[in-house]
Amino acid sequence: MGSLSRSEEMRFCQLIVEKDAAFNIVAEIGKQPYVQFKDLNPNVNSFQRTFVKDIRRYDEMERKLRFLESQIVKDEIVIPGRVDTGDYTILPTSELNTLEGTLTELEKDVKSMNDSDSQLKANFMDLKEWDAVLDKTDEFFQGGVDDQAQEELENLDEEGAVPRVEKGPVNYLVGIIRRERLNGFERVLWRACHHTAYIRSSDIEEELEDPGTGEKVHKSVFIIFLKGDRMRSIVEKVCDGFKAKLFKNCPKTFKERQSARNDVRARIQDLQTVLGQTREHRFRVLQAAANNHHQWLKQVRMIKTVFHMLNLFTFDGIGRFFVGECWIPLKHVEDVRKAIEVGAERSGSSVKPVLNILETSVTPPTYNETNKFTAVFQGIVDSYGIATYRELNPAPYTIITFPFLFSCMFGDLGHGCIMLMAGLWFVLREKNLQARNIKDEIFNMFFGGRYIILLMGLFSIHAGIIYNDMFAKSFNIFGSGWKNPYNASEIEGWINRTEHGKEMLVELAPEDAYDHAGGPYSFGVDPIWNIAENKLNFLNSMKMKLSVILGISQMTFGVILSFFNHTYNKSKIDIFTVFIPQMLFMGCIFMYLCLQIILKWLFFWTKEATVFGQIYPGSHCAPSLLIGLINMFMMKDRNAGFVVDGGKVNGEYREVETCYLSQWYPGQSVIEMILVVIAVICVPVMLFGKPIHHVMQQKKKAKELHGNATVRANVVSDSSEIVLNGGSKKEGAAHEEHGHGGHEDESFGDIMVHQAIHTIEYVLGCVSHTASYLRLWALSLAHAQLSEVLWHMVFVTGGLGISGTAGFIAVYVVFFIFFVLTISILVLMEGLSAFLHTLRLHWVEFQSKFYLGLGYPFVPYSFKTALQEAEAA
């Protein structure tokens, strides 16, 4: 927990390595995520850096690999393995040169095969079209279409309905066109030829493959009868405009067409054989490439990252050594030293690399070491803001509080089970799903949050049991603490009154109907409340008070955590002027309210009793906490006790009018007055405490500096310098002593404004944030009501109201509808809503009490991370 509760200690280091060993050393460092390099050449353009040529070389190799990958995917060949797994050792230079040559030859071969395949497919397409044209032409002539065309053209010529056509025999053109263009083609041709062309068409049943795009297309064969060369020219231009292909050498006789058809089909068969062999060869080549693709890509990308890191280094004066600066977690410094030594040995360097730890005033990056379980919770915190260096990390507490607050809003046993099963499915199939390398963004979002889904489902089951709620129904495990106090004659009387039109209202008074001897219900909510008319009144009151208690508890816990930050920073002024006043303010008002809620639950029951030494007549005198809180701030006088002094009159107590507004424990007004005064005093302490302390410290340091600077006039300059330097050291010590406060370099005005903002934010935030926690009650109410409405709308009104065989079938149909609506609305939509509200409660209400989040992340150089990012891009 140590590394997660507070970020790791960091060290700023300088790395000096020999030029020839730099590559292997950086490559060895990249095997573990321990080092974040600093760019020592910020003003140098990325295209002018030392290793830009090497990066371009491997960029070209990566481009070739991406081309091969596109061809492999196009042929639906599976690429085994993952890029970011396995060994991260870089191949020797000779093997990398061989790989470069292999990729060049592969790209050349695949492109050559693509060109050859495209040409073969184009020839195959031409032959298939020619075969279809020959078949359809026979069909046209067998149907007597030539005689019909001759007759129609001659009739048009004799009637003079259109301009006269040229003399001569009737000719025809045969062609092929895409089916979707046929209608437009016929209309344009009819108008362009002034109704003097006769056209007929027929669809080709077989789908043809476009050699350019590979898509399946539908085409039609057409035949056009016309007279004269002029009309032929017009037709050819229209065909060209519609990208229709004409076959001008179509045989005139059936015998010639039959001979041509036999020749075409023989050539088609030969081409199919050649295409099959070409595909087999292409498949073998791409399959071999696919088996090695991830390893090749991994090597190329790792080498690129090494050169990118080397571009962050600078040279020494003689150009023999590389100098780099980096951040390293303190506990991994020795691991990095070992990695550097291994890299130097691998390169055969005779000069031992040097790793120096430097002093710096720069704030280190924040590094919280996580695993696959804690990473999602750390991600939730980091989404709001990266923790300031060595600041207390909210993530360990979020692991419990986040799913718990979610379950308060999503508390349903049935819905929790669904969410739990979804989380379990992701967790149990974790390795299998990772190996499939699914790139769908929504899926990866759910998969990344698999552990938080699991916990939210588990906690929702717990909350559902407490609420006694499962798909809007209660379950009776421990029986009910309520009983029927009425006899048969009383029930008969109610039934008779109901039959006479009078409204019957059966009321179970807790004085008589509840089993007081059995104590509170064993666990959760009594199931009888599910059928009660005043169910919402009871549940709303309970959940509202629970929300207030949980909210104030979490905010108080946040304030307590701020104490550990102040202690770690050795800032006593923050403890006395921030933490203590904040705790007193929170305790005097809000923790006091929580105490009142709990005491009211414990002591103010339905029966007459003595509470805190005062006579309590019954539930109608239970104190009103809301009005009591208002009276507390107004310091309004209230009656002491619930009954009038003087005891009983006629055997009964004389109750105070509006007894629920009375003081319910001795000295309540005085105690509450003291609490209000303390809370009010805390505000100016928070507002002026640190600014006043700052002024006092400035005066003290100025006085010390003035005293140290007093030097006798006759002292030699060297001695004077020593005295003055001593004063500077004292000043630096004072600066160091109070440096953790964070305000020593700020002016009084800046600190005053800062404190004013934070004081106002805290005081108003305590009120607004407490109200904000009421969303726990509001969303729980909305979820329960929506679940109940869905149950009644689907089951009661729908399937369960139908009898007979139809009802038997309807139950299955209605259950399917209920299941779909439950998953889509009550689990996904309501779950997302509760998740976002829980996110807000943690980011604002909880973390604002102690978390600054002003840091920047530690981004270590790592082969695994670089490969994962490149794969996701």
Swiss-Prot record:
- Gene Ontology CC terms: apical plasma membrane; cell body membrane; cytoplasmic vesicle; exocytic vesicle; multivesicular body; multivesicular body membrane; plasma membrane; vacuolar proton-transporting V-type ATPase complex
Entry keyword DNA-binding: no
Entry keyword set: Cell membrane, Endosome, Glycoprotein, Hydrogen ion transport, Ion transport, Membrane, Transmembrane, Transmembrane helix, Transport
Keyword Transferase recorded: no
**InterPro entries tied to this protein:** V-ATPase_116kDa_su (IPR002490), V-type_ATPase_116kDa_su_euka (IPR026028)
Which residues lie toward the Cytoplasmic compartment?
A: 1-407, 467-543, 596-614, 690-785, 829-873
What happens when the protein's gene is inactivated? Answer: RNAi-mediated knockdown causes larval lethality at the L2 stage. RNAi-mediated knockdown causes defects in alae formation in L1 larvae and in the few surviving adults. Shorter body length.
For this UniProt entry, what is the primary localization, expressed as one broad class?
Answer: membrane
List the disulfide bonds in this chain: none
Give TM regions: 408-428, 446-466, 544-564, 575-595, 615-635, 669-689, 786-806, 808-828
Query: What does altering L786S do?
Result: Impaired alae formation. Animals are shorter and dumpier. Accumulation of multivesicular bodies in the epidermis. Impaired secretion of Hedgehog-related peptides such as wrt-2 in the epidermis
Example GO molecular function term? proton-transporting ATPase activity, rotational mechanism
Glycan-carrying positions = N565, N569
Membrane topology per record: Multi-pass membrane protein
GO-annotated biological processes = collagen and cuticulin-based cuticle development; exosomal secretion; multicellular organismal-level water homeostasis; nematode larval development; regulation of secretion; vacuolar acidification
Where found in the cell?
A: Apical cell membrane; Endosome, Multivesicular body membrane
Reported tissue expression: Expressed in the H-shaped excretory cell (at protein level). Expressed in hypodermal cells around the vulva. Expressed in the main epidermal syncytium. Expressed in the sheath cells associated with head and tail sensory organs; specifically, expressed in the apical sheath cells of the amphids and CEP neuron and in the sheath cells of the OLQ sensory organ.
Residues on Lumenal side? 429-445, 565-574, 636-668, 807
- Partners and quaternary state? V-ATPase is a heteromultimeric enzyme made up of two complexes: the ATP-hydrolytic V1 complex and the proton translocation V0 complex. The V1 complex consists of three catalytic AB heterodimers that form a heterohexamer, three peripheral stalks each consisting of EG heterodimers, one central rotor including subunits D and F, and the regulatory subunits C and H. The proton translocation complex V0 consists of the proton transport subunit a, a ring of proteolipid subunits c9c'', rotary subunit d, subunits e and f, and the accessory subunits vah-19/Ac45 and vah-20/PRR.
Function, as annotated: Subunit of the V0 complex of vacuolar(H+)-ATPase (V-ATPase), a multisubunit enzyme composed of a peripheral complex (V1) that hydrolyzes ATP and a membrane integral complex (V0) that translocates protons. V-ATPase is responsible for acidifying and maintaining the pH of intracellular compartments and in some cell types, is targeted to the plasma membrane, where it is responsible for acidifying the extracellular environment. Involved in the assembly of the V-ATPase complex. The V-ATPase is required for the function of the excretory canal.
Q: Which family does it belong to?
A: Belongs to the V-ATPase 116 kDa subunit family.
Q: What is this protein called?
A: V-type proton ATPase 116 kDa subunit a 2
Annotated organism of origin? Caenorhabditis elegans
